[in-house]
C-alpha cells in the first residue's frame, strides 16, 4: 500500500471517530441535564423520564458507534487500497 494512502486512511479514521463523538457527547450531556432537572421538578415522573432518557441515550450513542465502524473499515478493510 502506498504510504501516503495509509497515512491518509489513519487520519481519516481518527477524524471519523473524533467528529462522530462530539455531537452525541454534547447531546447526551444536555439530555441528562434536562432529565435531572425534570426529575427534580416532578419526582413522581422519575420512572417515565428515566426510561425515555435511556432510550434517547442509546440512539445518540449509536451515532458514535457508526463513526467507529467507519474508522475500522478505513483501517482494516481499506476500500481505497
From Swiss-Prot:
Compartments, as annotated in UniProt: Cellular thylakoid membrane
Disulfide bonds: none
Gene3D superfamilies per record: F1F0 ATP synthase subunit C (1.20.20.10)
Pfam families given in the database record: ATP-synt_C
Site location (Reversibly protonated during proton transport): 61
Domain of life: Bacteria
Keyword set includes Ion transport: yes
Coiled-coil residue windows: none
InterPro entries reported in the protein's UniProt record: ATP_synth_csu_bac/chlpt, ATP_synth_F0_csu, ATP_synth_F0_csu_DDCD_BS, ATP_synth_F0_csu_sf, ATPase_proteolipid_c-like_dom, F/V-ATP_Csub_sf
Primary location: membrane
Function: F(1)F(0) ATP synthase produces ATP from ADP in the presence of a proton or sodium gradient. F-type ATPases consist of two structural domains, F(1) containing the extramembraneous catalytic core and F(0) containing the membrane proton channel, linked together by a central stalk and a peripheral stalk. During catalysis, ATP synthesis in the catalytic domain of F(1) is coupled via a rotary mechanism of the central stalk subunits to proton translocation.
Subunit structure: F-type ATPases have 2 components, F(1) - the catalytic core - and F(0) - the membrane proton channel. F(1) has five subunits: alpha(3), beta(3), gamma(1), delta(1), epsilon(1). F(0) has four main subunits: a(1), b(1), b'(1) and c(10-14). The alpha and beta chains form an alternating ring which encloses part of the gamma chain. F(1) is attached to F(0) by a central stalk formed by the gamma and epsilon chains, while a peripheral stalk is formed by the delta, b and b' chains.
Family according to the record: Belongs to the ATPase C chain family.
Name by which UniProt lists this protein: ATP synthase subunit c
Species in which this protein is naturally found: Gloeothece citriformis (strain PCC 7424)
Amino acid at each position: 500500500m502506498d504510504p501516503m494512502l495509509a497515512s491518509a486512511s489513519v487520519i481519516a479514521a481518527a477524524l471519523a471517530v473524533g467528529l462522530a463523538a462530539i455531537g452525541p457527547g454534547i447531546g447526551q450531556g444536555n439530555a441528562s441535564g434536562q432529565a435531572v432537572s425534570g426529575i427534580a421538578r416532578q419526582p413522581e415522573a422519575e420512572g417515565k423520564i428515566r426510561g425515555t432518557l435511556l432510550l434517547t441515550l442509546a440512539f445518540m450513542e449509536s451515532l458514535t458507534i457508526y463513526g467507529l465502524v467507519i474508522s475500522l473499515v478505513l483501517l482494516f478493510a481499506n476500500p481505497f487500497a
